[in-house]
Amino acid sequence: MEVKVLECLRRLEEVEKLISDPNIFSNPKEYSSLSKEHARLSEIKNAHESILAAKKILHDDKLALSTEKDPEMIAMLEEGIQGGEESLERLSKQLENLLIPPDPDDDLSVIMELRAGTGGDEAALFVGDCVRMYHLYASIKGWQCEVLSASESDLGGYKEYIMGVSGTSVKRFLQYEAGTHRVQRVPETETQGRVHTSAVTIAVLPEPAEDDEEVFIDEKDLRIDTFRSSGAGGQHVNVTDSAVRITHIPTGVVVSCQDERSQHKNKAKAMRVLKARIRDAEVQKREQEASAMRSAQVGSGDRSERIRTYNFPQNRVTDHRIGLTLYNLDRVMQGELDMITTALVSHAHRQLFGHEETN
């Protein structure tokens, strides 16, 4: 890792020289690219300096402990050493993630589709909990979320919830959320205190950029139907045919949207989801054909693959793909997902480049 850090520090010096050249402003695209690279390399430099500082403090504390005689001071130093070692481990993992080479698609917006699986109303309630978790995570990361479609259940959860997420490194950290999420807890309606198991399926679809030539949809291949939106009743039920259903005839992909009162807005949202699903289908097809690439991923990404279990009675969350178990489910549900997502990104990178330790 030290060799990679030194390479990055040398590259940072080069980038700083390039950015300081006044002629760079005549090429906005190049300047933008260098600015992003400078920001990433600066993060690596700061993380490396933090590690060096933490190592020095740890070294000094251990040196002091070796000669200390006072029991109170010994206890303080031992506590400081333990905290310092934990901090050093955390900083090292942070640096390891920063050293992962950026993927051109890292910053792509994604569309997340959450659906209630087995478990009926309890599964729908957990969809609602997951929606809240991802919104909180997005807030922590400085991302933007947009509701594209939502189908509420009778008890306040969601049968289906589709959201768009945009921001820096969105795809990088959310792509491994695809799969089946299993929840084990006692439902509020359970009178005997028995633990029930439910499931939620999540799809994560990278949203094609506007200039993405890979996804071309011919208007002639679309069938667009409009209908009256259905709601829970009352004054907010739309009396016009504002809901939109779009069918892509060649693939059979169907997308409906009725959240907006404007037919035009519903159509625009439905088209975004449609493009993402068609792009995803093409990517899945290519990856299935390239088995070598598939084996280098964290799990298959198949929506039927059970990837994670949330056990509320034990306050435990387990990601089955990398064998990671944490006993802080309460914090995870409050949006502190980085401890899982960063581990998944690191694992995927090690597999891809053949650095995975052999058992």
Swiss-Prot record:
Matching InterPro entries:
PCRF, Pep_chain_release_fac_I, Pep_chain_release_fac_I_sf, Prokaryotic/Mito_RF, RF-1
Q: Where in the cell is it found?
A: Cytoplasm
How is the protein altered post-translationally, as described in the entry?
Methylated by PrmC. Methylation increases the termination efficiency of RF1.
Tell me which PROSITE patterns the record gives: RF_PROK_I
Keywords tagged on the record: Cytoplasm, Methylation, Protein biosynthesis
Coiled coil start-end: none
Main location (coarse class): cytoplasm
**What are the GO cellular component annotations?**
cytoplasm
Q: Where is this region: Disordered?
A: 285-310
Q: Which Pfam families match?
A: PCRF (PF03462), RF-1 (PF00472)
- Keyword Cytoplasm applies: yes
Residues with the modification N5-methylglutamine, per the entry, are Q235
Tell me, what is one Gene Ontology molecular-function annotation carried by this entry?
Answer: translation release factor activity, codon specific
Alphabetized NCBIfam families for the sequence = prfA, PRK00591.1
Family that this chain belongs to = Belongs to the prokaryotic/mitochondrial release factor family.
Q: What does this protein do?
A: Peptide chain release factor 1 directs the termination of translation in response to the peptide chain termination codons UAG and UAA.
This one is known as Peptide chain release factor 1
Q: Which organism is it from?
A: Chlamydia muridarum (strain MoPn / Nigg)
Organism lineage: Bacteria, Pseudomonadati, Chlamydiota, Chlamydiia, Chlamydiales
